[in-house]
């Protein structure tokens, strides 16, 4: 039970930042992304909003002085700023698009899957799967607050939970929604004991993905498709036009490998010949299933980020373009699967490093890496299955050829950065 926070006055143990006197809990606030205690100090006569300790691995809690209208303790700016502007960020618009409540037992666990980053939402969802069909928690009902973009993943167990689905863009989950607060409070009053699941992330290993609606194929005997995850907001190069040129060159080279080439993601004005273009301008309810099935058993290629999380889970091999600023969040944006040993992880995940704009990544290098996987597929497959194979030197040479090209900053990098900014300004 150490992953669960019980909502009662006995478990509340926050102290005043000024006098260290124990605070009095007034009420809970379930505003969406962040859950808050509203409390006061009898001695100082101060009123506060304090983060509930349901997040692990982030700089909580922020302590907001309601009288001063500011966060009065030392926390990271990205965590502090939304709370300091809470009066401007409280939203009364109803974003609840679906509600299904099934009250059976006397105990409830609330799972908050909302976040402004897709990868964070997904990690919380994977944590939820631990509780589904777990005998240890058979005496509990589960209330899941989920963004509409992830609902398709819970088809396999949606009938076992109560559900609040919300519909808005991920970026807007930085706001505080009164409709969510009101609905959760209406539900929890029907229970004797209520708990919030305490998130444990950054998490670097996903072990219960079989319960989710994802077509995972870790290994295949032969690669017959390559999937490019195409984004307008995460691009290779300085502009969308330069990204188009990059992928056009890469696709021309990939055609020589006799594999099907698919594009998924954002549709823009640029078109590609001789590919299966599954990009869309607007997400519809079925497109995620189509994309995931397309990625299943493939080589996926794209710019590093949580947008690559599910494609990398479904695929047999994953190639991501990374600038050095993104190294810190590998654990949050990469799915290290259950039972993958070190050798298997090296096989599955490949990273190609570039500058800030990824403009110095050569399509020829990417092609060489893809070819090393496709052409030597049988060697690789035998290696990860721990069977005997003879061409170990060839495999090592192929790894070296596709080795990560980590760049160091120099005088030439500064010049290149200036050139990139000029190109971005004039859109070439």
Predicted segments, located by residue:
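Short His-Asn-centered micro-motif
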Residues: 113, 144-147, 229-230, 263-266, ...
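Well-ordered, non-membrane alpha-helical segments in soluble/globular domains
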Residues: 121-131, 241-253, 284-294, 367-370
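Short loop/turn segments at strand-loop or loop-helix junctions that form parts
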Residues: 106-112, 196, 224-235, 264-266
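Secretory-pathway glycan-assembly enzymes, especially type II membrane glycosyltransferases
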Residues: 3-13, 17-221
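Catalytic donor nucleotide-activated moiety binding site of glycosyltransferases and closely related
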Residues: 146-149, 228-287
């Amino acid at each position: 039970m150490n992953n669960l926070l019980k909502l009662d006055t006995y478990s509340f143990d926050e102290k005043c930042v000024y006098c260290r006197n124990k605070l009095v809990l007034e009420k809970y606030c379930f505003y969406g992304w962040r859950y808050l205690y509203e409390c006061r100090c009898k001695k100082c006569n101060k009123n506060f909003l304090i983060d509930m300790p349901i997040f692990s691995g982030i700089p909580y809690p922020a302590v907001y002085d309601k009288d001063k209208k500011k966060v009065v303790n030392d926390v990271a700016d990205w965590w502090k700023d939304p709370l300091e502007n809470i009066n401007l960020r409280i939203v009364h618009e109803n974003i609840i698009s679906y509600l299904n409540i099934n009250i059976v037992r006397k105990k409830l666990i609330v799972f908050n899957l909302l976040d402004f980053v897709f990868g964070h939402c997904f990690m919380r969802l994977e944590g939820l799967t631990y509780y589904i069909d777990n005998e240890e928690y058979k005496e509990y009902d589960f209330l899941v607050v989920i963004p509409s973009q992830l609902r398709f993943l819970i088809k396999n167990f949606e009938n076992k939970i109560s559900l609040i689905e919300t519909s808005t863009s991920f970026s807007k989950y930085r706001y505080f929604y009164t409709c969510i607060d009101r609905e959760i409070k209406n539900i929890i009053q029907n229970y004797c004991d209520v708990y919030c699941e305490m998130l444990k992330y950054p998490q670097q290993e996903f072990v219960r993905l079989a319960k989710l609606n994802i077509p995972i194929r870790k290994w295949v005997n032969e690669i017959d498709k390559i999937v490019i995850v195409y984004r307008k907001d995460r691009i290779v190069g300085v502009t969308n036009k330069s990204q188009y040129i990059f992928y056009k060159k890469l696709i021309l080279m990939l055609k020589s490998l006799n594999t099907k080439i698919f594009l998924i993601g954002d549709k823009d004005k640029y078109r590609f010949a001789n590919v299966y273009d599954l990009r869309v301008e607007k997400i519809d309810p079925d497109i995620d299933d189509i994309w995931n099935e397309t990625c299943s058993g493939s080589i996926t290629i794209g710019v590093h980020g949580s947008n690559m999380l599910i494609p990398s889970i479904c695929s047999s091999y994953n190639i991501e373009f990374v600038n050095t600023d993104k190294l810190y969040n590998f654990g949050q944006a990469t799915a290290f699967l259950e039972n993958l040993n070190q050798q298997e992880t090296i096989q599955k995940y490949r990273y190609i490093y570039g500058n800030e704009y990824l403009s110095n990544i050569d399509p020829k290098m990417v092609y060489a890496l893809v070819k090393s996987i496709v052409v030597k597929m049988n060697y690789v497959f035998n290696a990860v299955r721990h069977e005997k194979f003879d061409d170990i030197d060839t495999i090592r040479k192929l790894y070296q050829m596709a080795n990560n090209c980590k760049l160091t900053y120099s005088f030439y990098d500064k010049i290149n950065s200036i050139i990139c900014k000029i190109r971005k300004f004039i859109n070439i």
